[in-house]
Amino acid sequence: MWNKNRLTQMLSIEYPIIQAGMAGSTTPKLVASVSNSGGLGTIGAGYFNTQQLEDEIDYVRQLTSNSFGVNVFVPSQQSYTSSQIENMNAWLKPYRRALHLEEPVVKITEEQQFKCHIDTIIKKQVPVCCFTFGIPSEQIISRLKAANVKLIGTATSVDEAIANEKAGMDAIVAQGSEAGGHRGSFLKPKNQLPMVGTISLVPQIVDVVSIPVIAAGGIMDGRGVLASIVLGAEGVQMGTAFLTSQDSNASELLRDAIINSKETDTVITKAFSGKLARGINNRFIEEMSQYEGDIPDYPIQNELTSSIRKAAANIGDKELIHMWSGQSPRLATTHPANTIMSNIINQINQIMQYK
């Protein structure tokens, strides 16, 4: 059976399909719907404070008794100067003026927020914790393992996969360059991140690690799931496929933009957050490209552009908001998450029967 392997056994799920923990875009309904359909729903905790994460976990548990996970951002060493912030504020001033916004006061709470997330995951006995942007400390990994939390790391290269296994991860997401949203890279210099496609990355990682590999990047339906399994993956992680679901927290602006875009419309940019991410191209990305080398690292840039993105979204201006999307938008639907899951499973079974 295609759906019975080490990963499904480890995560206590029926199907090896993981809904990506997209920060700012998941809802309890989305997470629970995927879990209730036999996959692993994942809370995107990246931007949550402690109380928000606790409430989200409690709400998910009201909707499902099945396994689910929480995705967290691993803090990274920030590299920026005061002149970078001053220059960026000057470059962003025309956008703020047009939207009647004041210059924000930047507050960096990334390290403390991460520690609180880990404490909450342990306190609430969350079954699975997924990491992006790096590998946590040995101490944190030990604490989570002692609490029987299954750990999933993210790798965009073979070297990152090896580092994840060595650190004690139970499984690894092999994130191909087709994936929407932030790149999970952490070993390469910030402007030279690996851009290896899913079909190349997955088998190369499978061949050098002994733990389950989860394919991610451009996978939208049953065909992508089966292709990943043939490459050696024991599961898939899907983001954009669930982002356009009516159960996600995506705005209608973003949902419509993805549904109406094509495979050539996305670009890699750090304009919005300070970390390279794939999204639909727009005016802000193009105008900020001239400053690409001077953009402050995440979370500084993310803080500096936050009010602009929120104000633009409120007035329906898609030229000034981030529209994260993978490279397979033509395959996106607005179905409820449980319908997306059943369609994927039915398509896989039909293909298997035909073959």
UniProtKB/Swiss-Prot annotation:
Domain of life of the source: Bacteria
The record's section on InterPro entries has: Aldolase_TIM, NMO
Q: Which reaction does it catalyse?
A: 3 propionate 3-nitronate + 3 O2 + H2O = 3 3-oxopropanoate + 2 nitrate + nitrite + H2O2 + 3 H(+)
Q: Which Pfam families match?
A: NMO (PF03060)
| E.C. number | 1.13.12.-
Cofactor(s) for this UniProt protein: FMN
Q: Which GO terms describe its molecular function?
A: nitronate monooxygenase activity; nucleotide binding
How, per the record, is the cofactor bound?
A: Binds 1 FMN per subunit.
Enumerate the residues binding FMN.
Answer: 71, 175, 180, 218, 237-240
Q: Which Gene3D superfamilies match?
A: Aldolase class I
This protein's UniProt keywords: Detoxification, Flavoprotein, FMN, Monooxygenase, Nucleotide-binding, Oxidoreductase
Chain coiled-coil ranges = none
Q: Name one GO biological process term.
A: response to toxic substance
The entry assigns this protein to a family as follows:
Belongs to the nitronate monooxygenase family. NMO class I subfamily.
The UniProt record's further free-text remark is: P3N is a potent irreversible inhibitor of the key enzyme succinate dehydrogenase in the Krebs cycle and electron transport chain. P3N has been shown to be a toxic metabolite to bacteria, plants, fungi, mammals or any organism that uses succinate dehydrogenase.
Q: What does this protein do?
A: Nitronate monooxygenase that uses molecular oxygen to catalyze the oxidative denitrification of alkyl nitronates. Acts on propionate 3-nitronate (P3N), the presumed physiological substrate. Probably functions in the detoxification of P3N, a metabolic poison produced by plants and fungi as a defense mechanism.
Q: What protein does this entry describe?
A: Probable nitronate monooxygenase
Species in which this protein is naturally found: Staphylococcus aureus (strain NCTC 8325 / PS 47)
Lineage of the organism: Bacteria, Bacillati, Bacillota, Bacilli, Bacillales
